Amino acid sequence: MKSFFAGAFILIISAFNSIYAQQFIDRVNFFTDTSLINATLTLNIKKILAEKEKEGYIFPATFSCKMGDSLNVNDQVSVEVRGHFRRTYCYLPPLKLIYKNNPAAAFYRLKSLKLVNTCVPTFSNDQNLLKEFLIYKIYNLITDKSFRVRLLNLSYKDNSGKKKTITQHAFLMEDIKEVAKRNNCADWTGKKCNTESTDRRQMTIVAVFEYMIGNTDWSVPVNHNIKLIHANNDPMSSPFVVPYDFDYSGFVNTSYAVPDERLGIESVRERVYRGFPRTMEELNDVLDIFNKQKANIYATINSLNTLTAETKSGIIDYLDDFYRTINNPSSVKRTFITNARE
């Protein structure tokens, strides 16, 4: 009889553990799933607007959504105000959702996720947000050493009842430690390094990609809009560059994006290559990646139903110009060698 009850108890505990385990969101599948998540972030909007100048300010919130057909998420989370320019300029600042302090949260295994939202809740800014989301998805096609993202239709609900609910698109970004882990790497904890001290081929991929999207708002030496990771099996090897934050790119073309006057261009839509010179052989090796992924890139753009036909057409026209450049040998030499950084 004792053995019967002992066995029954074990079965009950096993079943409970199985059910409990199923409540956690898988940190890998979360970003491989491409479906749109309808979610609500309940917080004190009035307070966040009053305190948004305080970078690192943390306050409580509730993140709710439905995952698949069965899991209703209602996580208590800590929300941190982050960002620099967008934190001060935009109506709602960028946030970080922190789950690691709540083991009962469905998103616990994802630890913390950056939340990227529209600058001001208007239709044009919503389209810009979707364009920045697309940039991450496109870069995923170019290299695995990239941040993965998940699109949300997000409602900001004020728990004080003093502000109207705001609904807009937003996206969640993978943590850099997860980027490193799935690439058999670790987060770089060494000193800041010069551009040419990073992995040469990966740096070439990054520089060409930034040129592709018309983005000059990045710098390796000052860790501006880039993260570094290094190979686990060789901590002394050159680190790999992982870019992020693309709202200043010509691809997105936000109203607040203005180029550095030292670049000699009038609009962020004008491309400037910010990489260092490479041999034609090195360039052809990297440009071949972009050419092989062209059809997939264009398919990714056209498959995003939340973008208008006009927005898609503008993006494709902008990328067509890039592809004309990289498939013209004289343009390749002029752009990536002659006019490269010294």
Task: Give the residues covered by each predicted segment.
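Phosphate/dinucleotide-binding and metal-coordinating scaffold of catalytic cores
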Residues: Q22-E342
